[in-house]
Amino acid sequence: MAEAWFETVAIAQQRAKRRLPKSVYSSLIAASEKGITVADNVAAFSELGFAPHVIGATDKRDLSTTVMGQEVSLPVIISPTGVQAVDPGGEVAVARAAAARGTVMGLSSFASKPIEEVIAANPKTFFQVYWQGGRDALAERVERARQAGAVGLVVTTDWTFSHGRDWGSPKIPEEMNLKTILRLSPEAITRPRWLWKFAKTLRPPDLRVPNQGRRGEPGPPFFAAYGEWMATPPPTWEDIGWLRELWGGPFMLKGVMRVDDAKRAVDAGVSAISVSNHGGNNLDGTPASIRALPAVSAAVGDQVEVLLDGGIRRGSDVVKAVALGARAVMIGRAYLWGLAANGQAGVENVLDILRGGIDSALMGLGHASVHDLSPADILVPTGFIRDLGVPSRRDV
């Protein structure tokens, strides 16, 4: 199995591209419109440098931290992503990998596996919801998550409908039936490893979302749930406060890019915020999340935990984010490429890559712990930071 191991996230992406049908792979790299934001999410990290210490490195480094009360062995958690049809194990395989590496699993309400199965694989699971279907529907969804044992709730606000992608939108079928299988077979048959994995289970990729129905039921098709989300009016801050109170436990608001929104989130009583542009799948032209992080972190201080997602490909990226104010980062595409490349072991491989990179960067900076990191460790070029939602001088 030596050939199954990969050295970098970039290699995992290459293997995912080789092993997945084109339409499945395209769903992993898809982003809004021109893809300006998704490209900037990655490129922005390369603009940041380090200020290393040549003397004083310790022989052992502590990467552990906590996220919304959950102890994690490294400052990386799994971001919730929908319908993980890249591997038959899907979200359960990812949850097991996260548990094996000592971190939190984020489970999407658009996931293909029931929350009960995922929490059985990893008790440290945060359940994610969109503002979809109104208060009554959300109350049912949240109560099921509570009964299943979810230890945190994530509310995603940074996803809007993209009206055009220059490379084309992913061709996701409405449901997986015989007609669909026959239509996709010419594409799938060119990827025998992927096809054989599903053939062994005697089940095609599941495009239903079981966590949007009652326990034990298959749930609605993906696009039925997606349509309900599109038809639901966006939430108000009062809605966010209501949902936080309803949940009554650790509560993260995902998608905060502006200082004024971050302050409103604090007022709403959230436990954590994630600086995020939904991996470039929101409003194209939004700055990279790492550019917005320093201003948001400075604005809220220690009133709430601040996380970041978007563009994480290396352990050094994680270190840059933590130094600039993040408690931890959330990864999405990186672990999905690992899942496609080698199932659960591939996700563990990705987490190991990030762990090794974090450790190496800490050593180079002369720090014994991720908690020792600060902005002084990072070279930030002039004009890099985007302080969105801050009144300009002429407005003051």
Curated annotation (Swiss-Prot):
Top-level taxon:
Bacteria
Per UniProt, the keywords (alphabetical) are: Flavoprotein, FMN, Oxidoreductase
InterPro entries linked: Aldolase_TIM, Alpha-hydoxy_acid_DH_FMN, FMN-dep_DH, FMN_HAD, MftD
Pfam families according to UniProt: FMN_dh
According to its UniProt record, this protein's enzyme class is: oxidoreductase
Q: What is its EC number?
A: 1.4.3.26
**Known function:** Involved in the biosynthesis of the enzyme cofactor mycofactocin (MFT). Catalyzes the oxidative deamination of AHDP (3-amino-5-[(4-hydroxyphenyl)methyl]-4,4-dimethyl-2-pyrrolidin-2-one), forming an alpha-keto amide moiety on the resulting molecule, which is called pre-mycofactocin (PMFT). This reaction occurs via a 5-[(4-hydroxyphenyl)methyl]-3-imino-4,4-dimethylpyrrolidin-2-one intermediate, which converts to PMFT. The alpha-keto amide moiety is the redox-active center for the redox activity of mycofactocin.
| UniProt protein name | Pre-mycofactocin synthase
As recorded in Swiss-Prot or TrEMBL, the protein's gene is named mftD
